[in-house]
Amino acid sequence: MRLCALVVTALLGLTAPAQADEELRPFMILGDAIPESLTGTPGDPAKGRAIVANRQLGLCLLCHTGPFPEERFQGTLSPSLAGAGSRWSAGQLRLRMVDAQRLNPDTIMPAYYRIGGLRRVARAFEGKTLLSAGQVEDVVAYLATLKDP
């Protein structure tokens, strides 16, 4: 449990918060998914890959491994991102990005698009999401391309 707290603290301490002037967009959860885009438009998979691999923004590789041969020291705490698009729909990926605790209250994965009900929030992140709605959609678009061979 102590390791989990350290990982979450590291995630929150190293990422840059989304723009403060962006309002949290409403979304609807159906089952285990958010079926509709947060922005109303599809994300950009190339931008999504850059966010996933960015150790200052998404920090995904702190916990996950994936198809990033150029990135050293990938995490082993969470499932591999390889094949994510085969395992989950875009809506399921979106809910995991927005607030994975809706599916697993004990997860160490941070809520990338939530501002309420959080603990130990760094001052720089108060009232802000970790990623913008557009960035969430970019990551979802990229992860959806990761199909099993």
Predicted feature residues:
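Bacterial N-terminal signal peptides
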Residues: 4-15
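Gly/Gly-Pro-rich "capping" loops immediately C-terminal to redox-active cysteine motifs
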Residues: 41-42, 51, 61, 65-99, ...
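Electrostatic cytochrome c docking/interface patches
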Residues: 22-55
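Domain-scale selection of a single, long terminal region
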Residues: 1-6, 28-29
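Short pre-active-site segment immediately N-terminal to redox-active cysteine/selenocysteine motifs
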Residues: 55-59, 135
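C-terminal capping alpha-helices of c-type cytochrome domains
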Residues: 91, 95-96, 112-149
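Sec/Tat signal peptide C-region and signal peptidase I cleavage site
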Residues: 16-20
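Sec-exported extracytoplasmic/periplasmic mature domains
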Residues: 53, 86, 98-102, 141-148
